């Protein structure tokens, strides 16, 4: 199954509160919204991708519990980006002082903040171009570091704020650099 994009703009402009309500009233459907206001219905992942997402998230949570530098999120969290888009990265992380600057209401709904770090793990049905466009959208919204992991091609694209995309072929690990100090993601099991 692939993602489906629906454009309601000629009929009605969906407000932030309406989009939030749409998501709340349809908890079994994962929605995103691009900067043009189009609604994207995201398909569920298969078992393998879901397992790898879970394992990767666990690595981030363990690191973050040890360092207490920020807040980790999984793909069920939708962020309101500065461009107006609503996106749900597979893994994301926000530095603690930035998260603490949000109001309780902002934290409760779709936080109006771009994460410092995002990770997208492609599933077999994901479009590479659409996922690359999403990664570029994150960078355009001031995300500092992003990893696009493509298990099919055994390739990782590293996105850094203000820099060219770096492409790695079958890396065994990724460093969180200065954004995620001391974090290293082991990728050996991902390529098996």
Regions found by a protein language model. Give the residues of each.
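Gly/Pro/Ser/Thr-rich low-complexity, intrinsically disordered segments predominantly at protein N-termini
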Residues: 1-192
